[in-house]
Amino acid sequence: DRGAHAKGPDGSLADTPDEGAVYRCNPDGTQLEVFARGLRNPQSLAFTENGDLLTGDNDCDKGDEERLVHVVQGGDSGWRVGYQHPLIDKDSPWLADKLWQPRTKDTAAYILSPICNIEDGPSGLTYYPGTGLNDSYRGSLFITHFKGSVAKSGIYTYNVKPKGAGYAIADSKPFLTSALPTDVKFGPDGRLYTSDWADGWPKSKRGRIYAISDPQHAKDALVLETQKLIAQDWTKASVSELTVLLAHADQRVRQEAQFTFAERGASSIAPLTAIVSSPSSKPYARLHALWALGQLAPKNPAALNPLTQLLRDSDSEVRAQSAKLLGD
């Protein structure tokens, strides 16, 4: 959150001298750019199943609170490093104008307010991929809250629901307590893995990694299938197999199918167009087909041809993603 000045191998520049930000580039580092700005010590990033980006950032310890942020292209979440050191006896705009709070009628119009304020010390996060636990966790973000004390720290879940063009929290609750987790991720085996600091402040001399599973779902056929699919050689998958897997219950499998289509180049445009243009295709299959077409577009502009028609699609998410891709 104290700024960055980074160059890509092609000379592209991301320059944010006084704020935390999210950057975007091609897999080879080219076309580096600032995607969103105004964050304070953001910790990790996670995509929802609709392709929206979320993060948690930290407060400045002056009476403000941590935030769950919907990271939007071109968005400004309000933080500047100068707010950490305001003039004596003067509140910075961060505090005086309550820029850290969710939007109200008095919020500055130029910033993208957080979805909500959250527990102290977000240090890592992950989004439930769709397999491994029970269905109550669908749409949930898992955030580790590192507060320096075992008694106060843990993992919380935040169930996010679309609200207009943004998100709202439907529910939040503790998932794991009496631990000092620093990060959290779902493994291909359906278990939730978390790194643990162990002893609190000062610096710990040991650490642990825990694996958490639901015994009622650990051996589900879908969990075992997901583990096998993630480990498979995707280069050998046929077009028909990839088409089916674009609609898989697990987000990671859908992404593998999407990226495999994209890696095959222009030959994928026809099958992807057929998927995304058919109202009978599963909703997630259509979205991942759209994103694969977007990946192909820089070298194959014809990949975007179907998208103009999709701006009038009956599915609002298909319309939204088509507009984003065309705007890029």
PLM regions: where:
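Outer-membrane beta-barrel transmembrane domain signature of Gram-negative proteins
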Residues: 306-318, 322
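Residue-level detector of extended alpha-helical repeat arrays and alpha-solenoid scaffolds
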Residues: 253-254, 283-286, 319
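Short inter-helical turns and helix N-cap capping residues of alpha-solenoid HEAT/ARM repeat scaffolds
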Residues: 249-250, 280-282, 314-315
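Amphipathic alpha-helical scaffolding segments comprising HEAT/armadillo-like alpha-solenoid repeats
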Residues: 236-244, 266-277, 298-311
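Alpha-helical segment of the N-proximal tetratricopeptide repeat
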Residues: 241-244, 251-264
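Beta-propeller domains with acidic blade repeats across secreted/periplasmic ectodomains
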Residues: 1-241
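Hydrophobic core positions within HEAT/HEAT-like alpha-solenoid repeats
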Residues: 243, 258, 273, 287-290, ...
